Curated annotation (Swiss-Prot):
GO molecular function: methylated histone binding
Biological function: Chromatin reader component of the transcription coactivator SAGA complex. SAGA acts as a general cofactor required for essentially all RNA polymerase II transcription. At the promoters, SAGA is required for transcription pre-initiation complex (PIC) recruitment. It influences RNA polymerase II transcriptional activity through different activities such as TBP interaction (via core/TAF module) and promoter selectivity, interaction with transcription activators (via Tra1/SPT module), and chromatin modification through histone acetylation (via HAT module) and deubiquitination (via DUB module).
Region (Histone H3K4me3 N-terminus binding): 155-157, 200-203
Location relative to the cell: Cytoplasm; Nucleus
Lineage: Eukaryota, Fungi, Dikarya, Ascomycota, Taphrinomycotina
Family: Belongs to the SGF29 family.
Domain SGF29 C-terminal residue range list: 109-244
GO biological process, one term: regulation of transcription by RNA polymerase II
Region described as Histone H3K4me3 binding: 222-225
UniProt entry tagged with the keyword Transcription regulation: yes
Site feature: Histone H3K4me3 binding: Y198, Y205
Organism: Schizosaccharomyces pombe (strain 972 / ATCC 24843) (Fission yeast)
Protein's recorded name: SAGA complex subunit Sgf29
Oligomer and partners: Component of the 1.8 MDa SAGA (Spt-Ada-Gcn5 acetyltransferase) complex, which is composed of 19 subunits tra1, spt7, taf5, ngg1/ada3, sgf73, spt20, spt8, taf12, taf6, hfi1/ada1, ubp8, gcn5, ada2, spt3, sgf29, taf10, taf9, sgf11 and sus1.
Chief location of this protein within or outside the cell: cytoplasm
Amino acid sequence: MVRPINAEEDVTSMWVKFHESLNPIRSSLIKQEECYKTVDGDDNPIEERIKACDAGIQTSEEQKKELEHTMQSLEMIINVLEKANEKPVITNSPLTRSRRNRGTSFTANTVTFTPGMSVAFKLPYTRHNEGGDWIQCIIIKVTGEGAKQRFEVQDPEPDDDGNAGQIYKTTANHLIQIPAKGTPLPPISPKTNVLARYPETTTFYRAEVIRTLPDGSCKLRFEGEEEVGKETVVERHLVLEYNG
């Protein structure tokens, strides 16, 4: 029995339970495949094929119920994340010089990072990773205050086995807020260096702004683009001003 999601839980627990809810669906798909093979087998007795057909129908009905529960859980998670992104808490303190050198988000004020907020996260340096890459993550936990404040962020993309995305521990210096889609944002001047999410990925790369389009999106030239002179259009809220 999959544990139901409670709206008062933290995002981590909600994601874990959501992935657990996918297991019965995977099992039912395997059962359906077995039923299909039996029904499709011309050499199988007719009684066995009819029995497999009935079992397949029953499995489909069970799968429908599981999918309904899963969709409800996913909608609850989305609602929590949307609320967190729609109402960020912002203080009036200006960024310190050291923080500004590391990177700034769409506002000149210090952002108060909260659970559920979407952020660009700078991957740490490890033996297997040279570091410096930025990926889209979700803040799932905040501890401490002031200089001792720490964050846990999670990659929203599940791994190849369908498990929940990796969780990282970090500080505010390695985070940039990603504004919610539809947030009014000022245009960015041509030739400005930015971090932007490359289309169809969750990774942010350095780019140069060519111009802002009438719909507010930005036409960019990404650093290291294989196709020489290629220009790419990216939605404005996924283009982050960055001086790093």
